Curated annotation (Swiss-Prot):
GO BP terms in the entry: carbohydrate metabolic process; peptidoglycan biosynthetic process; UDP-N-acetylglucosamine biosynthetic process
Alphabetical list of Pfam families matching this protein: PGM_PMM_I, PGM_PMM_II, PGM_PMM_III, PGM_PMM_IV
Keywords attached to this entry: Isomerase, Magnesium, Metal-binding, Phosphoprotein
Summary of the function given for this chain in its UniProt record: Catalyzes the conversion of glucosamine-6-phosphate to glucosamine-1-phosphate.
Protein's UniProt name: Phosphoglucosamine mutase
Cofactors required: Mg(2+)
Gene of this entry: glmM
HAMAP family on file: GlmM_B (MF_01554_B)
């Protein structure tokens, strides 16, 4: 496949008002999407549009709507909703595509566009390529009698809450649970508190007063220390934090210890194995902690690593017939319950596992020993990151680093595809070994730069 002009691994994202993150580009993007869907479907397409709570979402929602309607597509405006909710609604409302206006865990001054297929999955490469090609064609407005219509959908919240509840057993209850819930002033702010309270939990809510500018600002999954402090303050059993668009989830245990995506993956894998639910291989990424790999091996649970990005985790799960995977950042995939990473659904799966296994998140993690891991970003003065990584002296240093931690950890290099940076990561069961190996390897990269 040729290099993408606009799309990254998870749609389009950037600073509002700069480059493609502008109203005029998004207007053309909506028009291109409408034309491509009409050609593929051979009929008037229906497109759902959702967004998170950042203020620029209003501008981009209007631009997308206008571009789609001009191309002859009908539009249903969902309003602020978690990204995975749009994936679900696109499928259940029989739409031809879903669009989410969000920059996920980024600050309010960023925004982005991501797409879902009619099946509620990430848009395939061929369709994205067709949209990019259509963007280079002139804006097209169909005849008046063929213009699309736009309506607001009023029952989306109720539909999504029932979908989330259906992901756990019918008798599932959270009456045992006192929790702190951090909604990142984002797309889960009006849904997650209602859902967990309906299931019986005592809920202390933070980060649920969006003003368009405070999304992810000192709250949410990128600021887990805030959640941890509140868990200790209120004496809660645990805390749950989502990111701005609700596709990530991290937690804190009853002592306020941060619980990342690797930890949650372990809780689910062990519980699902015991209940017979686990199928295929558990999938992590290059960044998944070596300690998790070792812990799963001790349980005879097969594990494989994909490239960083939930798109690649999803691809590996589908190819290998698995249903459970995720990233350290909190993107968890439970493909027997949802088509994409869903923070609320993933949190419910963890709570269901805890309900079976003694209610304590801290105890559920007592048999997982993660190893020290650190990443250093080496900025390059000149030359492409990929070329630096492939240089003979850097490859020699990498082989030496890998030999130093063999059987005790890992060492690897990741050239950035978007900036002149090489990411150097080392992990080992001994902190001094990890740091010494990291210093030598990152030094070799700096010397080559």
């Amino acid at each position: 496949m040729s290099a993408r002009k606009y799309f990254g691994t998870d749609g389009i994202r950037g600073r509002v008002g700069q480059g493609v993150i502008s109203a005029d580009f998004v207007l053309r993007l909506g028009n291109a999407l409408g034309r491509v869907l009409t050609q593929i479907r051979g009929k008037r397409p229906l497109v759902l549009i959702g967004k998170d709570t950042r203020i620029s979402g209003y501008m981009f929602e209007a631009a997308l709507e206008a571009g789609l309607v001009a191309a002859g597509a009908d539009v249903q405006l969902i309003g602020p909703m978690p990204t995975p909710a749009i994936a679900f609604l696109t499928s259940t409302l029989r739409a031809d595509a879903g669009v989410v206006i969000s920059a996920s865990h980024n600050p309010h001054y960023d925004n982005g566009i991501k797409f879902f297929s009619a099946e509620g999955e990430k848009l395939d490469d061929a369709t994205e390529a067709a949209i990019e090609a259509a963007l280079d064609a002139p804006f097209h407005t169909v005849e008046s009698e063929r213009l699309g219509k736009a309506i607001r959908t009023r029952d989306a919240i109720g539909r999504y809450i029932e979908f989330c509840k259906a992901s756990v057993a019918r008798g599932f209850t959270l009456k045992w649970l006192k929790m702190v819930l951090d909604c990142a002033h984002g797309a889960t702010y009006h849904i997650a508190p209602m859902l967990f309270r309906e299931l019986g939990a005592e809920v202390v809510v933070i980060g649920a007063a969006p003003d368009g500018l405070n999304i992810n600002a000192g709250v949410g999954s990128t600021h887990i220390d805030n959640l941890a402090a509140k868990v200790r303050e209120y004496g809660a059993h645990l805390g749950i934090a989502f990111d701005g668009d609700g596709d990530r989830v991290l937690m804190a245990d009853d002592q306020g210890n941060p619980v990342d995506g690797d930890d949650l993956l372990y809780v689910l894998a062990r519980s699902w194995q015991a209940s017979g639910r686990l199928t295929g291989t558990v999938v992590g990424t290059l960044m998944t902690n070596y300690g998790l790999e070792q812990a799963l091996a001790a349980l005879n649970i097969p594990f494989q690593r994909a490239k960083v990005g939930d798109r690649y985790v999803h691809q590996a799960l589908v190819e290998g017939g698995g249903t459970l995977g995720g990233e350290t950042s909190g993107h968890l995939l439970c493909l027997d319950r949802a088509t994409t990473g869903d923070g609320i659904v993933s949190a419910l799966q963890v709570l269901e596992a805890l309900g079976r296994d003694g209610h304590s998140l801290r105890k559920a993690l007592s048999s997982l020993s993660k190893v020290p891991q650190k990443t250093v970003n080496v900025r390059l003065d000149g030359g492409a990151a990929k070329a630096i990584v492939e240089a003979a002296n850097v490859q020699q240093a990498l082989q030496q680093a890998q030999a130093a931690v063999q059987g005790r950890g890992r060492a690897f290099l990741r050239p950035s595809g978007t900036e002149p940076v090489v990411r150097v990561t080392v992990e080992a069961d001994d902190a001094r070994l990890m740091q010494d190996t990291l210093d030598r390897l990152s030094g070799a990269v700096r010397d080559a730069a």
